Swiss-Prot record:
Binds 2 Zn(2+) ions per subunit. Zn(2+) 1 binds at residues 83, 85, 170, 189. Its cofactor is Zn(2+). It catalyses: hexadecanoyl-CoA + H2O = hexadecanoate + CoA + H(+); dodecanoyl-CoA + H2O = dodecanoate + CoA + H(+); tetradecanoyl-CoA + H2O = tetradecanoate + CoA + H(+); octadecanoyl-CoA + H2O = octadecanoate + CoA + H(+). It comes from Mus musculus. Signal peptide: none annotated. This is Acyl-coenzyme A thioesterase MBLAC2. Acyl-CoA thioesterases are a group of enzymes that catalyze the hydrolysis of acyl-CoAs to the free fatty acid and coenzyme A (CoASH), providing the potential to regulate intracellular levels of acyl-CoAs, free fatty acids and CoASH. Has an acyl-CoA thioesterase activity towards the long chain fatty acyl-CoA thioester palmitoyl-CoA (hexadecanoyl-CoA; C16:0-CoA). Displays a substrate preference for fatty acyl-CoAs with chain-lengths C12-C18. InterPro entries: Metallo-B-lactamas, NDM-1-like, RibonucZ/Hydroxyglut_hydro.
Length: 279
């Protein structure tokens, strides 16, 4: 299967494109965002990486190919992972320039499929990307980041800037990217319009509460009007406020106890399926 078949996209205007993996039918299917700038383009999350995402970007005309991969005339392209979970980081190995938060840089560099929570089944991939492909073969490949991100860093695209916000809770290195001028928030799995996951091995409820308080502050200060999340559909500031507030309100003792049990089961399952890379 070609990259042009595997991916599909639509334009949201203002140089932003929403890309998805057509034949990965799962709640884990991540949104891939392309943000075009005057001096640099940025891909936010890369999906599973079962077909070449860079090939799709150029073959579909989303980006202009000025020649060979080494051609200095090509505008720089940076792949940013909002976190290293497999559904977001699987395609990072296809890019020359890769950025991730420092808290998860080591896990990515060693291909730690325990921390990437790799969990994929044949039933979720409704058309095999290549003959004989099986989900049990899938692993997130080790990638050495070329850019280590911290809270407050700014990624300069020329005519727009994306500010890094370290937002742990879902994972220890989760980030949002905030376009302050346009009041757009690329939220990864920090927040999306669904049940927020805080029961994975490196999730932490106390961190998530602090993150949600930051999200509420963004809304209160009028700094976000549109959220482009890691899963499902986009939404606005009012929904962002409600999602963050609801999480804080439920994060009591009962939730912590049930989450502890779920985290224990998830960790056990991941250690069985990813024995070589679990700590």
């Amino acid at each position: 299967m070609s990259a042009l078949e595997w991916y599909a996209h639509k334009s949201l205007g203002d140089g932003i494109f929403w890309i998805q993996e057509r034949f990965y039918e799962s709640g884990n299917r991540a949104n891939i965002w392309l943000v075009r700038g005057s001096e640099q383009d940025v891909v936010i999350d890369t999906g599973l990486g079962l077909r070449s995402l860079p090939e799709y970007l150029y073959s579909s005309g989303l980006l202009q190919d000025c020649g060979s991969k080494e051609d200095a005339g090509r505008r720089p392209l940076l792949a940013v992972a909002t976190h290293v979970h497999f559904d977001h980081s699987g395609g990072l190995y296809q890019f020359d320039q890769v950025a991730v938060h420092r808290a998860e840089a080591e896990a990515l560099a060693r291909g730690d499929n325990f921390e990437t929570v790799t969990w994929l089944s044949d039933s979720e991939v409704v058309r095999a990307p290549s003959p004989g492909w099986r989900a049990r073969q899938f692993r997130v490949q080790a990638v050495q980041p070329t850019l280590i991100l911290q809270d407050g860093d700014v990624i300069n695209l020329g005519d727009r800037q994306l500010t890094v916000m370290h937002m742990p809770g879902h994972s220890r290195g989760s980030i949002c990217l905030h376009d302050k001028d346009r009041k757009v928030l690329f939220s990864g799995d920090v927040v999306y319009d669904g049940s927020l996951i805080d029961w994975l091995p490196y999730s932490r409820i106390s961190d998530y509460v602090g993150t949600c308080e930051r999200l509420i502050e963004l809304v209160d200060r009028g700094l976000v009007e549109k959220v482009l999340p890691g899963h499902f559909n986009t939404f606005g500031a009012e929904r962002l406020f409600r999602l963050a507030s609801n999480y804080i309100s439920k994060a009591g003792i009962c939730h912590k106890v049930s989450t502890f049990a779920m985290r224990s089961l998830a960790s056990l399952a991941l250690r069985v399926t990813n024995p070589r890379t679990s700590p």
